[in-house]
Curated annotation (Swiss-Prot):
Gene3D superfamilies to which the protein is assigned, alphabetical: 2.40.30.20, ATP synthase alpha/beta chain, C-terminal domain (1.20.150.20), P-loop containing nucleotide triphosphate hydrolases (3.40.50.300)
Main location: membrane
Record membrane topology: Peripheral membrane protein
Family matches, as SUPFAM superfamilies: C-terminal domain of alpha and beta subunits of F1 ATP synthase, N-terminal domain of alpha and beta subunits of F1 ATP synthase, P-loop containing nucleoside triphosphate hydrolases
Organism taxonomic ancestry: Bacteria, Bacillati, Cyanobacteriota, Cyanophyceae, Synechococcales
UniProt organism field: Prochlorococcus marinus (strain MIT 9211)
Protein name from the UniProt record: ATP synthase subunit alpha
Length: 504
C-alpha cells in the first residue's frame, strides 16, 4: 500500500492556489444566423465596429460591413466551407492590415498580404492599415516631376507626373495592361517602387505579366497583388486598397512609387455584388450609392508629398474597361471625374494597326507641361495639334477628289507622325530616343521618306545614335534639355540616316 504524505499534498495544493490566475478573458461573441453567397448574418457582436475583422470558428476571417438593429452583415474573405448556421463568431478589435516593407519586393501576394508565389514566407515585421486617410493639402506639393512611361506618344502629348492619377480607359483587348507594364519596365534604374494590382483577372494572365516583369528585370522593384476571378468578391474589393497601403509605406519613406489598378471596373462589380447581397439599396446600373466614394478614397491616396513629409510620391494609373467605347457609363464617368486626366484607347485604331492605340483627340493630362522635361516640351508643343488636325483632314479628304498642295503636305506629315509614334510592346524608349524621333517628325525632316519606311527609319535612327553618337544620348539624359549644339548633332544624324536609307 502506497503511503500518502499529507504534508506533500498540502504543499502542492498551496503552490497551485498561489499560482492561480483569476484573470477573465472577455470576448465579443456572436452566432451565425444565415450563411450563403459569401455573406454571413450574425446575431450578437454588439460592440463590433464598421469595417472590423471578425473571426469564424474555422479560422476564416470576415469584415463587418452592415451594422443593423438585430444583426450584423459580414462579408467572408475566403471559401468558408466550415462556417455554418449556429457557428460562433468573435470580433477581433482590429481593422484589416497588410504587411509592408522591403521584403515585399519581387513577391506576389493576395489582398491580405499573404504570399501566393510559392517562395516561402515574407520576413517583415512592419504592417499598415489597408484603409488609411489620404494626405491633406498642407502635406502635398503640386506635381512637377515627370514619370516617364517610355511610350513616346504619352510622354510627348499626355505627360504624366509623379503623384498624378492618370486613367487608362478603353475596350477590352486594346492594350491597356500593355501600357501599364511598359511603364513599370521603364522605371528600371529610376529608384521607383512599383505595385501592380490585378483585380478579377484570369490567373494565367497574371502569371504571364509576372513572367514578363521577371524577364525584363522589373520584378525586383515590383510587388504584385493578385485577387483573381476565382477569389471571393470581398478580396477583389480589398485588393486595390492593399496595393495603395503597400505603396504608401514607401511613399512616406520619401520614395517615388507607381501603382497600377488593373482594373477598377472589376472592383466596382465586386463591390456591387457584395452590396446587393447585403441588401443595400441599388442606384444607377444597380451600383450602390457609395461606389463613387469607393474609388475616390482610393485614388485620393495618390500624392506628391511636400519636403517636410519627405518628398515621396505615389502615382496611380487606374484602368477602366468600357463597353463598345462608351465612356459615358456610370463607372467610367466617375473615375474620369476623380483622376487628373485620361488616356483613351480606341479599338478602331488598334485594329487599324496603330499600337499603342491612343486616341489623341480625347486623351488629356490635366497636369500637362508641369510634369514634362524641357527637351520634349520644346519640340512636342505642336505635335498634339498637328495630329488632331490630321485626323480631321483625313476624314474630310475621303470625300474630296482634288486637294491643294498644302493640304496634301499636311496629310503626308500626319501619316508620318502616326508611323513614328508606333511602338513595339515591352520596348520603352528613353528620353533621348523619344526626342530624336519626335524632332524628326515635327521639324519635317522626314517628309521625303516614304510612309511605309518611316518605322524602319525610326529604328535605324535610334540604332545610329546609340552606336555613333553616345555623347548625344548621355547629354540629353543628364541635362534633359535641348541646346543649339544638341540640335545640330540631331539634325546631322537624322540627315545621315535619311540619306543612307533613300540611297539604298
Amino acid at each position: 500500500m502506497v503511503s500518502i504524505r499529507p504534508d506533500e499534498i498540502s504543499s502542492i495544493l498551496k503552490q497551485q492556489i498561489a499560482n492561480y490566475d483569476k484573470s477573465v478573458s472577455v470576448s465579443n461573441v456572436g452566432t451565425v444566423l444565415q450563411i450563403g453567397d459569401g455573406i454571413a448574418r450574425i446575431y450578437g457582436l454588439e460592440k463590433v465596429m464598421a469595417g472590423e475583422l471578425v473571426e469564424f470558428e474555422d479560422g476564416t476571417e470576415g469584415i463587418a460591413l452592415n451594422l443593423e438593429d438585430d444583426n450584423v452583415g459580414a462579408v467572408l474573405m475566403g471559401e468558408a466551407l466550415g462556417v455554418q448556421e449556429g457557428s460562433t463568431v468573435k470580433s477581433t478589435g482590429k481593422i484589416a492590415s497588410v504587411p509592408v516593407g522591403q521584403a515585399m519586393l519581387g513577391r506576389v501576394v493576395n489582398p491580405l498580404g499573404q504570399p501566393v508565389d510559392g517562395n516561402g514566407d515574407i520576413a517583415t515585421s512592419d504592417s499598415r492599415l489597408i484603409e488609411s486617410l489620404a494626405p491633406g493639402i498642407i502635406k502635398r506639393k503640386s506635381v512637377h516631376e515627370p514619370m516617364q512611361t517610355g511610350i513616346t506618344s504619352i510622354d510627348a502629348m499626355i505627360p504624366i507626373g509623379r503623384g498624378q492619377r492618370e486613367l487608362i480607359i478603353g475596350d477590352r483587348q486594346t492594350g491597356k495592361t500593355a501600357i501599364a507594364i511598359d511603364t513599370i519596365i521603364n522605371q528600371k534604374g529610376q529608384d521607383v517602387v512599383c505595385v501592380y494590382v490585378a483585380v478579377g483577372q484570369k490567373s494565367a494572365s497574371v502569371a504571364q505579366v509576372v513572367e514578363v516583369l521577371r524577364e525584363k528585370g522589373a520584378l525586383e522593384y515590383t510587388i504584385v497583388v493578385n485577387a483573381s476571378a476565382s477569389e471571393a468578391a470581398a478580396l477583389q474589393y480589398l485588393a486595390p486598397y492593399t496595393g495603395a497601403a503597400i505603396a504608401e509605406h514607401f511613399m512616406y519613406q520619401g520614395k517615388a512609387t507607381l501603382v497600377i489598378y488593373d482594373d477598377l471596373t472589376k472592383q466596382a462589380q465586386a463591390y456591387r455584388q457584395m452590396s446587393l447581397l447585403l441588401r443595400r439599396p441599388p442606384g444607377r446600373e444597380a451600383y450602390p450609392g457609395d461606389v463613387f466614394y469607393c474609388h475616390s478614397r482610393l485614388l485620393e491616396r495618390a500624392a506628391k508629398l511636400s519636403e517636410s513629409m519627405g518628398s515621396g510620391s505615389m502615382t496611380a494609373l487606374p484602368i477602366i474597361e468600357t463597353q463598345a467605347g462608351d465612356v459615358s457609363a456610370y463607372i467610367p464617368t466617375n473615375v474620369i471625374s476623380i483622376t487628373d486626366g485620361q488616356i483613351f484607347l480606341s479599338a478602331d485604331l488598334f485594329n487599324s494597326g496603330l499600337r499603342p492605340a491612343i486616341n489623341v483627340g480625347i486623351s488629356v493630362s490635366r497636369v500637362g507641361g508641369a510634369a514634362q522635361t524641357k527637351a520634349i516640351k520644346k519640340i512636342a508643343g505642336t505635335l498634339k495639334l498637328e495630329l488632331a488636325q490630321f485626323d480631321e483632314l483625313a476624314a474630310f479628304s475621303q470625300f474630296a477628289s482634288d486637294l491643294d498642295e498644302a493640304t496634301q503636305k499636311q496629310l503626308g506629315r500626319g501619316k508620318r507622325l502616326r508611323e513614328l509614334l508606333k511602338q513595339a510592346q515591352f520596348a520603352p524608349l528613353n528620353l533621348a530616343e523619344q526626342v530624336a524621333v519626335v524632332y524628326a517628325g515635327v521639324k519635317g525632316l522626314i517628309d521625303e521618306v516614304p510612309v511605309e519606311q518611316v518605322t524602319q527609319f525610326a529604328g535605324e535612327l535610334r540604332e545610329y545614335l546609340k552606336t555613333s553618337k553616345p555623347d548625344y544620348i548621355k547629354q540629353v539624359l543628364t541635362e534633359k534639355k535641348l541646346n543649339e549644339e544638341i540640335e545640330s548633332v540631331l539634325k546631322e544624324s537624322i540627315n545621315e540616316v535619311k540619306s543612307s536609307m533613300l540611297a539604298a
